[in-house]
A protein has these predicted regions:
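A glycine-rich helix->loop->beta "capping" turn
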Residues: 34-48, 54-55, 80, 84-85, ...
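Rossmann-fold cofactor-recognition segment
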Residues: 11-28, 36
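Catalytic loop of short-chain dehydrogenase/reductase
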Residues: 52-59, 81-154, 165-168
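Hydrophobic positions on the long internal alpha-helix
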Residues: 31, 47, 72-80, 143-144
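Hydrophobic structural elements of the Rossmann-like NAD(P)H-binding subdomain
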Residues: 47, 88-90, 158-161, 171
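Canonical Rossmann dinucleotide-binding motif of NAD(H)/NADP(H)-dependent dehydrogenases/reductases
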Residues: 1-9
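A hydrophobic alpha-helix adjacent to the NAD(P)-binding/active-site core of NAD(P)-dependent oxidoreductases
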Residues: 17, 61-62
């Protein structure tokens, strides 16, 4: 995109154009506000790619892999609408494996209460983190499917992609 003359900005924990800890509500709120401040006339697209793997705590996995992406997308949706932009959410090919807990997927997508979801995550043992990872990514993909018709009414496209293992700082 940059090679084509487009401006690309990123939100990252360290070293991004906008620095924010997206695993916290304060970080998500600050990131959304920073994008609004910089691009009040709208944005062409959003790629929500933040996440942590199964070595993180269950709470951090749910906070970053599920809630942060949704809150960014919803918080920036009006900016996307101004330019009829699109949103891509990064899910994972792990959503098809045996570690997905459909009860957790249902809880995340139906409850939509971040505080209660994170309370559940705090009660889970670290040994459940692989299931937390795949379940959070499955829930994110399900959320995208649920909201895509409403986004389409506004002329917006939203989709989830499920790449395989990709060389990122998380996988190195």
């Amino acid at each position: 995109l940059q090679g084509g003359g487009h401006e690309v900005s990123n939100i990252d924990y360290k070293g991004g154009d906008f620095q924010a800890d997206l695993s916290t509500q304060e970080g998500v709120d600050a990131a959304v506000q920073a994008v609004w401040d910089r691009y009040p006339d709208g944005i062409d697209g959003l790629i929500s790619n933040a996440g942590v793997g199964p070595t993180a705590t269950p709470e951090k996995i749910f906070a970053l892999n599920f809630y942060a992406g949704i809150e960014l997308a919803e918080g920036l949706r009006p900016l996307l609408k101004k330019k009829r932009g699109c949103c891509v959410m990064t899910s994972s090919n792990s959503i098809t494996n045996f570690t997905v807990r459909m009860d957790w997927v249902e809880l995340l997508t139906n409850l939509r209460n971040k505080q209660r979801g994170l309370e559940l995550a705090r009660m889970l043992p670290q040994q459940q983190s692989a299931s937390c990872y795949s379940s959070s990514k499955h829930a994110l993909a399900r959320w995208v499917r649920r909201v895509s018709p409403a986004w389409a009414v506004d002329g917006l496209r939203i989709n989830a992609v499920a790449p395989g293992n990709t060389a990122t700082p998380m996988t190195r």
